[in-house]
Amino acid sequence: DPCYEVCLQQHGNVKECEEACKHPVEY
C-alpha cells in the first residue's frame, strides 16, 4: 500500500500508519 509505505518512510510508526491509511490522509 503506497500510503503505508510513505507513512512508514516518513514516520516509522506501524500502528499510526495502519490507522492513518484506513482513511484518506495527507502528508
UniProtKB/Swiss-Prot annotation:
GO terms for cellular component: extracellular region. This is Potassium channel toxin kappa-KTx 2.2. Its main location: secreted. OmTx1 decreases the amplitude of the potassium current of the rat channels Kv1.1/KCNA1 by 17% and Kv1.2/KCNA2 by 12% as well as human Kv1.3/KCNA3 by 24%. OmTx2 decreases the amplitude of the potassium current of the rat channels Kv1.1/KCNA1 by 8% and Kv1.2/KCNA2 by 10% as well as human Kv1.3/KCNA3 by 36%. Also alters glucose-induced insulin release from pancreatic islets. Disulfide bonds join 3-21, 7-17. Keywords: Disulfide bond, Ion channel impairing toxin, Neurotoxin, Potassium channel impairing toxin, Secreted, Toxin, Voltage-gated potassium channel impairing toxin. Expressed by the venom gland. It is found in: Secreted. Coiled coil: none annotated. GO terms for molecular function: potassium channel regulator activity; toxin activity. Has the structural arrangement of two alpha-helices stabilized by disulfide bonds (CSalpha/alpha 2(S-S)). Belongs to the short scorpion toxin superfamily. Potassium channel inhibitor kappa-KTx family. Kappa-KTx 2 subfamily. It comes from the Eukaryota. Transmembrane segments: none annotated.
